[in-house]
Amino acid sequence: MENKQYTTRELFRRFAPYFKKYRFTLCMDLFCAALTTVCELVLPLIMRYITNEGLRDLAALSVKTIFTLGILYFGLRIVDCIAGYYISDMGHVMGAKIETDMRRDAYNHLQKLSNTYYNNTKVGQIMGRITNDLFDVTEFAHHCPEEFFIAGIKTVISFVILANINLPLTLMIFLCVPLMCGVCMILNFRMRSAFRKQRNQIGELNARIEDSLLGHKVVKAFTNEEVENEKFEKDNGTFLDIKKLTYRYMAAFNTTVKLFDGLMYLVVLVAGGIFMVRGKIAAGDLVAYMLYVSTLIATIRRIIEFAEQFQRGMTGIERFLQIVDADIEIFDEPDAVELKDPKGEISFEKVSFEYPDDHNKVFTNLNLQIHAGEKVAIVGPSGGGKTTLCNLIPRFYDVSEGKILLDGQDIKRFTLKSLRGNIGIVQQDVYLFSGTIYENISYGRPGASKEDVIEAAKRAGAHDFIMELKDGYDTYVGERGVKLSGGQKQRISIARVFLKNPPIIILDEATSALDNESEFAVAKSLGELSEGRTTLTIAHRLSSIRNSDRILVLTDDGIVEEGDHDQLMEQKGIYYQFYETANALK
């Protein structure tokens, strides 16, 4: 995963459109924020009036006036509470909705990314980006516009009122603000860098834990618990070091703010006292001045405290953008059409291919014709490109040169959904989703009737063993199907393809990991599955492909032998050597 870095301006520009759907809520949130701010700024004015009037002529200050001011302030407090409730409720809901929208966009984009992306990216990193990182965006989306809006209002109004009370003193106070902001911006930049490292390390830690837990059987089999603990401790220790650095920057940040807080209070205390002694500011004005300065400093402190949340949110947005900006390498052409009822005739015309991260060509000018309904087996040494060849047909990868035709048309002319919808794949490493057997079979055709699911299971030879289970089709298979045997999982995956009912079948070493009994049952199911369909079979067990219409021997030099079993045995070439070696091992 490319860890591209974005400027703050670019992050705001990319994030802002997510507020578009919630403009009314945002405007109401800011309006309520303005109300709470105004309510808060009225109290010092009331205190100023009472103090000045009391010192000027205590007898003129009636109880009625004080009660009137008290009722006014109480009314403003009620307004403040109602506005605050809206901010806390609807404002946070808006943030949660934006987080949900971003997570949806990230997940939808991940669905479109090619195998190359997943080959080069740790799942733990991806999980961290679409879960933990976006949690911080909820608070950021709510508080960021609100906090800066409130700060802007309070700063402007406070400056106007303070300047009206005593301009020289106000200028002294506000001279401290640019200096404080400059220092804080430097520390903010360092905090952002630390938070970025922290998030990356969390992803590495998640990937380490996931890898170890998924491979727990291998860990136990090799008694390597201590080795895994050492790896974990190393990654965990790195995370701690990064977090220490983050807290160090945060401590420096908070200390700087407190220092400037004290400096501003000191200016008011000393300069304000001198102005009062010289009669340039009234006592009531100085009281109000202190209250407004306290409000101003509290606002600045609130923004400073928000800085940590701000940096977390910006880091979360940045890591989100690194997902949605990942290039989609396999996509529909602008004029792509739906593939309907294909016959299944496949042609490779001068196909060359190399993986994006490896410049060594797997194929060079490969030509191959597969007739509709033909059963073709592909054998050869490991690393010869058998699986790669089959992965090119459903466009899990695109050819580097040449083209692949389906029924005489370039496969790129068809939409990915319709192309892959007409191809069924049974792999050696069966992946079952966490859920029931019924849910896993119906994955082949979502929305299929129960009768169709059961019929697919019967044709795959899975129905009998399913019914022997306590919960039948409602049996929970566990994560990746761990509660089932290899043969059972394979037959469920075959049932899934039966339900899909595609005209083209790819069998990628579908029986190589099974015992003899399971292989016999699965081979029978595969035989029925391939009947009447264009079938490509990759196999190491040559006994499973003897009845293929045609067998191809694929090596680094391309297709070096071709024919049925008897023809290849007569040639006494590579296939003959493979077959004799397999028999000798038996």
What is each stretch, according to the model?
Residues 2-5, 96, 104-128, 132-134, ...:
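Short intracellular "coupling" helices and adjacent cytoplasmic loop segments at the cytosolic face
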Residues 11, 19, 87, 91-95, ...:
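Juxtamembrane loop-to-helix connectors within ABC transporter transmembrane domains
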Residues 24, 115-116, 132-141, 145, ...:
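An intracellular "coupling" helix at the cytosolic face of ABC transporter transmembrane type-1 domains
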Residues 26-86, 163-168, 279-283:
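Transmembrane helix-loop-helix hairpins at lipid-water interfaces of multipass membrane proteins
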Residues 31, 35, 39, 43, ...:
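Hydrophobic alpha-helical transmembrane segments of ABC transporter permease domains
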Residues 31-32, 76-95, 146-153, 174-198, ...:
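Alpha-helical transmembrane segments of multi-pass membrane proteins
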Residues 56-68, 161-175, 245, 249-318, ...:
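Helix-loop-helix
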Residues 332, 339-586:
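ABC-type nucleotide-binding domain
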